[in-house]
């Protein structure tokens, strides 16, 4: 099962998932930032570019059952500039490296 909580969509069954991926109308480029794995739960933090456009943040939350993805939720969001008022408490070290070229 694949879900997009932000749009309310759900895709059930491997064939629906495969066909959705096959029919996707844009060229996608991914840049993996981090993978966190605990027991049967994996969280993947990526950047995604659609048709060479600027990067967008994407988080995949996957639950595994018997070495297969049983349930996946995908969250997609734009980044934003840090608020200036937080600067006095912010570390000089970035949380993540700058974006690569899409």
Identify what each model region corresponds to.
Residues 1-102:
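C-terminal and inter-domain tail/linker signature
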